Amino acid sequence: MEALGDLEGPRAPGGDDPAGSAGETPGWLSREQVFVLISAASVNLGSMMCYSILGPFFPKEAEKKGASNTIIGMIFGCFALFELLASLVFGNYLVHIGAKFMFVAGMFVSGGVTILFGVLDRVPDGPVFIAMCFLVRVMDAVSFAAAMTASSSILAKAFPNNVATVLGSLETFSGLGLILGPPVGGFLYQSFGYEVPFIVLGCVVLLMVPLNMYILPNYESDPGEHSFWKLIALPKVGLIAFVINSLSSCFGFLDPTLSLFVLEKFNLPAGYVGLVFLGMALSYAISSPLFGLLSDKRPPLRKWLLVFGNLITAGCYMLLGPVPILHIKSQLWLLVLILVVSGLSAGMSIIPTFPEILSCAHENGFEEGLSTLGLVSGLFSAMWSIGAFMGPTLGGFLYEKIGFEWAAAIQGLWALISGLAMGLFYLLEYSRRKRSKSQNILSTEEERTTLLPNET
């Protein structure tokens, strides 16, 4: 792939050089970089399959066990809440714990608890089932946070000059996980029952653990002086965090609601419901590498990708139902088309956020090493988790009260507000820089005039 062919060797800025950079061929991937890509691809694929497998059939099973739509939304949402808390801790202590250990341990626990989720159908109905669902999801959330925080940091360390390209390319595997999870889960559920999808997927993730223990390189760094709170206090970082939050909530909103809406509206079997999820995930997976390459090759484009991606996402969610005031009839082909466009707009907005935060951190005095990468990774995961908690929780509640059409429109307002806020910030930033540049030119002209000899 051309994007990866141009990547430079793992030469970290600030003299914090990753191992294995010696003896590598300029302009091509070193052995360690290839291993890092394989490890990150495996965790992206496995983790997103574990996350998305519930969508087509779990809401229906949970209803049989006595859970309401609101409770189902909270079961989906609690994953993100505890991922938020764990991401902040793991991001702050990444250097102390060790990136490789955090990565491998996260995958191991994630595979184990995925298998545990498969035996929950044997738990008694009602409060006991609901409590066990929450417990297993919390354990999965902590392991997911560990693996993903470590993965992002290791990638940014190995590819310091092409962060967006690499992250965007690897989002293909995240998208592939989102693509494969629902249809594979729906098919296995329809063919073999509730337990088999979780046991199969959990075993696949566990098989990836020894591979990553062997091939993933160790990266060491000294602890940094800056904190998470200093990073989030930067205005630009705070607004980008809001963008991440809004987009994550849009993804999360669909987990407890879309399958129920499709089953009710179009009477599709569970296996076909998984295929509806395919449109958004596939377009996101395909577009992410392109937007990553654009973000690295043309950094000024990042701001416009962020803004317009949010605005397009907002429009998509208005049309997802569609919202009744538009008087457009709900049709399956229209729903799939809107999900495809929404996947494209999500990739447009999400991919530039990590390099934008990292760039802003470096501009404001954060050191260029693994410590800052851990903070940025933790912040990204934490903000994503807030949205992924609020999206399903609020989505399940609104679906129950006002129906899918209006609930989706309200969800779209979140993306609209974040897009407009980000656009306003960039306009103010441009105006401020232009005014500062004009003042500097004027000051330079005045100094030059005073230095010229007076004419007699």
From Swiss-Prot:
Any Gene Ontology biological process: serotonin uptake
Membrane topology category: Multi-pass membrane protein
Catalytic activity: spermine(in) + n H(+)(out) = spermine(out) + n H(+)(in); spermidine(in) + n H(+)(out) = spermidine(out) + n H(+)(in); serotonin(in) + n H(+)(out) = serotonin(out) + n H(+)(in)
Gene of this entry: SLC18B1
Any matching Pfam family: MFS_1
Family: Belongs to the major facilitator superfamily.
Transmembrane segments: 34-54, 71-91, 101-121, 128-148, 162-184, 196-216, 231-251, 273-293, 305-325, 332-352, 378-398, 408-428
Origin organism lineage: Eukaryota, Metazoa, Chordata, Craniata, Vertebrata
InterPro entries: MFS, MFS_dom, MFS_trans_sf, MFS_Vesicular_Transporter
Cellular component, GO, one term: secretory granule membrane
Protein name in the entry: MFS-type transporter SLC18B1
Function: Proton-coupled polyamine antiporter involved in the translocation of polyamines from cytosol into secretory vesicles prior to their release via exocytosis. Uses the electrochemical proton gradient generated by a V-type proton-pumping ATPase to couple the efflux of protons with the uptake of a polyamine molecule. Facilitates vesicular storage of spermine and spermidine in astrocytes with an impact on glutamatergic neuronal transmission and memory formation.
Low complexity compositional bias, start-end: 10-23
Membrane topology (Cytoplasmic): 1-33, 92-100, 149-161, 217-230, 294-304, 353-377, 429-456
Compartments reported by the entry: Cytoplasmic vesicle, Secretory vesicle membrane; Cytoplasmic vesicle, Secretory vesicle, Synaptic vesicle membrane
Primary residence: membrane
Positions carrying N-acetylmethionine: 1
Region (Disordered): 1-24
Extracellular side: 55-70, 122-127, 185-195, 252-272, 326-331, 399-407
Entry-annotated residues carrying Phosphoserine: 21, 438
PANTHER family: GH10249P, MFS-TYPE TRANSPORTER SLC18B1
Keywords: Acetylation, Cytoplasmic vesicle, Membrane, Phosphoprotein, Synapse, Transmembrane, Transmembrane helix, Transport
GO MF term (any one): monoamine:proton antiporter activity
Tissue: Expressed in various tissues including lung, placenta, adrenal gland, liver, testis, and brain.
